[in-house]
């Protein structure tokens, strides 16, 4: 669709098999789509627009969640103002659905600005993983993590843990 000119995240629906959830970095919507590209459900997550990068899904305490990474930072100007939106995955229906969005606020252990691209959720360890873009000085990216629980909120800034470095041969 025109409102998703650049898809930045895609994950299979766990609630409605045969559908993908997709998200663009140029809108505030998550959409359900068939493999043939037919759009169905629209979830609007109203906020002041930021560079959305990455979408993941997973199960926590027998509930399916979707996670949206609000951490793209091409200008490296946000420093400690990075967020993850998460909400219970709805059933795919025609039209718009409303969800109760929760927000996790996080920063990086070095206290600097980063430009991340990927979010992943580990159902076994209940961890969120974030991968930042490579550093142009040494051509590496970094994988970070933080434990996930539904008690996390916007008021507390959670600091990521550095996991490992990625180079060109690792990807």
Regions found by a protein language model. Give the residues of each.
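Sequence/structural signature of beta-propeller domains
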Residues: 1-171
């Amino acid at each position: 669709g025109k409102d998703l000119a650049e898809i930045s995240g895609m994950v299979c629906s766990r609630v409605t098999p045969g559908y993908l959830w997709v998200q663009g970095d140029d809108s505030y919507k998550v959409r359900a789509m068939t493999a043939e590209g037919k759009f169905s459900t629209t979830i609007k997550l109203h906020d002041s627009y930021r560079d959305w990068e990455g979408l993941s899904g997973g199960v926590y305490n027998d509930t399916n969640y979707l996670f949206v990474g609000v951490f793209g930072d091409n200008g490296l100007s946000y420093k400690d103002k990075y967020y993850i939106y998460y909400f219970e995955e709805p059933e795919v229906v025609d039209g718009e659905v409303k969800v109760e969005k929760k927000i996790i606020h996080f920063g990086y252990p070095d206290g600097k600005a980063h430009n991340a691209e990927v979010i992943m959720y580990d159902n076994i360890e209940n961890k969120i993983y974030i991968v930042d873009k490579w550093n142009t000085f040494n051509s590496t990216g970094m994988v970070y993590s933080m434990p996930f629980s539904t008690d996390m909120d916007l008021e507390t800034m959670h600091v990521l843990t550095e996991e490992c470095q990625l180079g060109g041969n690792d990807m």
